[in-house]
């Protein structure tokens, strides 16, 4: 029997000219992770920062929790974009509702109307979750999320998943917000049709 020795292959070295030819690669590597050396509390960030990989994603993300236990995800801009889209949609709906009201109400109470409508759309209740599950087949083992189709044993666990879904790398709350906005528009359209029908019958 011959003795085989393990061959160690040397790693390829990147020359300075190659690095200067591809500055985008180095800039992306430099901006992908936060620089812990520049911060004053570098040790604390090293303790509170972890690398997180969701089960559905092939990518890993650098996640940090600060002193107030707020979650910050580096390298995952989709969450912020989705949240931003949801907030923009809410602001557009609020603007439409304010514009549809009378001019006197716009001049006197625009901020209060914005706050009330935004708070109503932002809070997802158990009734909203049950209403969204009507379009899905009835589940015997628990409750199914209408956004990500995951099963949860109790309604409380599903509600907590919707509220804190951004910690898992995505947000089902945006989906339920949009559903609630659509339901509000449908309800307004139905009430408007009823009022128009009532006025037509009165004229007849």
From Swiss-Prot:
Keyword Calcium annotated: no
Keywords of the record: Differentiation, Membrane, Nucleus, Spermatogenesis
Matches recorded under Pfam families: Spt46 (PF17734)
Expression across tissues: Testis-specific.
Record's function text: Plays a role in spermiogenesis and fertilization.
Swiss-Prot/TrEMBL GO biological process terms: cell differentiation; fusion of sperm to egg plasma membrane involved in single fertilization; spermatogenesis
Example of a GO cellular component annotation carried by this entry: nuclear membrane
InterPro entries: Spt46-like
Region annotation (Disordered) ranges: 101-120
Cell compartments where the protein resides: Nucleus membrane
Traits of the deletion mutant: Deficient mice develop and grow normally. Knockout males, but not females, exhibit subfertile capacity. Deficient mice are characterized by abnormal sperm head shape and a failure of sperm-egg fusion.
The name this protein goes by in its record: Spermatogenesis-associated protein 46
């Amino acid at each position: 029997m011959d003795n085989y020795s393990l061959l160690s292959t040397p790693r390829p070295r990147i020359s300075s000219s190659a690095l200067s030819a591809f500055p985008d690669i180095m800039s992306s590597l430099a901006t992908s992770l936060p620089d812990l050396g520049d911060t004053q509390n570098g040790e604390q960030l090293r303790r509170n920062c972890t690398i997180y990989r969701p089960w559905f994603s092939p990518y890993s993300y650098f996640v940090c929790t600060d002193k107030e236990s707020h979650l910050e995800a580096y390298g995952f801009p989709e969450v912020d974009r989705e949240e931003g889209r949801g907030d923009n949609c809410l602001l557009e709906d609020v603007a439409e509702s304010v514009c549809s009201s009378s001019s006197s109400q716009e001049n006197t109470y625009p901020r209060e109307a914005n706050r009330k409508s935004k708070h109503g759309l932002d809070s997802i209740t158990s009734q909203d979750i049950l209403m969204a599950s009507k379009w899905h087949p009835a589940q015997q083992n628990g409750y199914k999320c209408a956004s990500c189709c995951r099963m949860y044993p109790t309604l409380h666990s599903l509600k907590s998943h919707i509220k804190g879904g951004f910690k898992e790398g995505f947000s089902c709350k945006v989906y339920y917000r949009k559903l609630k906005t659509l339901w509000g528009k449908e309800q307004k359209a139905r009430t408007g049709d009823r009022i128009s029908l009532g006025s037509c019958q009165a004229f007849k």
